[in-house]
């Protein structure tokens, strides 16, 4: 009897040399699902391509959504800028000074990456004039405190003779090369030079200044000089007033740097140089205002009406 025939059927393949590579029972391998024998069978996954396509589609959809959101944000910013610009033009047409705040400064260009759409709070603000109604009137009239006028007497003068013979006259050529003369009515002071020029100061009105200059010329005539009254002219007018509220000078000088200077260590007042009319104002924290440099009274009043809305915008609220 053959030895191979005595073996069970499932072991006959293993016992024969030819059957060593031909197993008698199916062999399961994790690398070969349900393969028979030792011949490798390729693994086929029909769902792998569809999964990759779905992932690519999802990524494309997400990118499209992000682009749409950025476009919507840019469009919203542009609309806000257009609306603020129209509001400012409307305010300018109504006589108001347009305002500019941080929330109205927007970026309309396409923004890459994580660039913020709105500026940071540290963005510097453009200096502007505080907005107040143009029709608002202060109701305050500056009072004239001093008027400086000049006149030409038209002749050479001997200052020593004038100082010796005239009343209320003093002359010290080492200190000042002019005779200083004073009268009581109107209460003024005159500086008389040897060239015949005279400066009159201290008058409270134009009429008082002219009257005082004529009185000084008459005194010189009585001393024997052929004095005349030529080329009378007001050179400077000084006025003052009180706005009745304290003023933030630090904020005023920051927003009007090209017109003002403020050095509290040197002088307690803010110096404001107005362009039109050409007036210099001294503004104090207490609310007192001094106006100088005017040739006519109307310039004093006009300058104060121009500066009053600005001062009201910097009123202290404490």
From Swiss-Prot:
GO molecular function: RNA polymerase I core promoter sequence-specific DNA binding; RNA polymerase II general transcription initiation factor binding; RNA polymerase III general transcription initiation factor activity
Keywords noted in UniProt: DNA-binding, Nucleus, Repeat, Transcription
Spans annotated as Disordered: 1-21, 106-138
PROSITE patterns: TFIID (PS00351)
Location(s) in or outside the cell: Nucleus
Entries under SUPFAM superfamilies matching the protein: TATA-box binding protein-like
Gene Ontology biological process terms from the UniProt entry: transcription by RNA polymerase II; transcription by RNA polymerase III
Sequence repeats: 144-220, 234-311
Keyword Repeat: yes
Positions contributing to DNA binding: 146, 182, 197, 236, 273
Comp. bias regions, Low complexity: 106-117, 125-135
InterPro entries associated with the record: TBP, TBP_CS, TBP_dom_sf, TBP_eukaryotic
Domain of life: Eukaryota
Complexes and interactors: Binds DNA as monomer. Belongs to the TFIID complex together with the TBP-associated factors (TAFs). Part of a TFIID-containing RNA polymerase II pre-initiation complex that is composed of TBP and at least GTF2A1, GTF2A2, GTF2E1, GTF2E2, GTF2F1, GTF2H2, GTF2H3, GTF2H4, GTF2H5, GTF2B, TCEA1, ERCC2, ERCC3, TAF1, TAF2, TAF3, TAF4, TAF5, TAF6, TAF7, TAF8, TAF9, TAF10, TAF11, TAF12 and TAF13. Component of the transcription factor SL1/TIF-IB complex, composed of TBP and at least TAF1A, TAF1B, TAF1C and TAF1D. Association of TBP to form either TFIID or SL1/TIF-IB appears to be mutually exclusive.
Similarity field: Belongs to the TBP family.
Function: General transcription factor that functions at the core of the DNA-binding multiprotein factor TFIID. Binding of TFIID to the TATA box is the initial transcriptional step of the pre-initiation complex (PIC), playing a role in the activation of eukaryotic genes transcribed by RNA polymerase II. Component of a BRF2-containing transcription factor complex that regulates transcription mediated by RNA polymerase III. Component of the transcription factor SL1/TIF-IB complex, which is involved in the assembly of the PIC (pre-initiation complex) during RNA polymerase I-dependent transcription.
The protein's name in its UniProt record: TATA-box-binding protein
Gene: TBP
């Amino acid at each position: 009897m053959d030895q191979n025939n005595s073996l069970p059927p499932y072991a006959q393949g293993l016992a024969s040399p030819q059957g060593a590579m031909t197993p008698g029972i199916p062999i399961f391998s994790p690398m070969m699902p349900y393969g028979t024998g030792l011949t490798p069978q390729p693994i086929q996954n029909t769902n792998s391509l569809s999964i990759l396509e779905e992932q690519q589609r999802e990524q494309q959809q997400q990118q499209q959504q992000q682009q749409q959101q950025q476009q919507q944000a840019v469009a919203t910013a542009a609309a806000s800028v257009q609306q603020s610009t129209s509001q400012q033009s409307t305010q300018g047409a109504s006589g108001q000074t347009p305002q500019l705040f941080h929330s109205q400064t927007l970026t309309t260009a396409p923004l890459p990456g994580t660039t913020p759409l709105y500026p940071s709070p540290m963005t510097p603000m453009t200096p502007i004039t505080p907005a107040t109604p143009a029709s608002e009137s202060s109701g305050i009239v500056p009072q004239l405190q001093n008027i400086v006028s000049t006149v030409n007497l038209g002749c050479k003068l001997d200052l020593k003779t004038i100082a010796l013979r005239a009343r209320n006259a003093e002359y010290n050529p080492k200190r000042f090369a002019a005779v200083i003369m004073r009268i009581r009515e109107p209460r003024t002071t005159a500086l008389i030079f040897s060239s015949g020029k005279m400066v009159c100061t201290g008058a409270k009105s134009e009429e008082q200044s002219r009257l005082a200059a004529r009185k000084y010329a008459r005194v010189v005539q009585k001393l024997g000089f052929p004095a005349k009254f030529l080329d009378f002219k007001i050179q400077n007018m000084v006025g003052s007033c009180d706005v009745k509220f304290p003023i933030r000078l630090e904020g005023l000088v920051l927003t009007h740097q090209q017109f003002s200077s403020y050095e509290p260590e040197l002088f307690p007042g803010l110096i404001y140089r107005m362009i039109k009319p050409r007036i210099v104002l001294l503004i104090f924290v207490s609310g007192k205002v001094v106006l100088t440099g005017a040739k006519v009274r109307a310039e004093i009043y006009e300058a104060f009406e121009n500066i009053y809305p600005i001062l009201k915008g910097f009123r202290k609220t404490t």
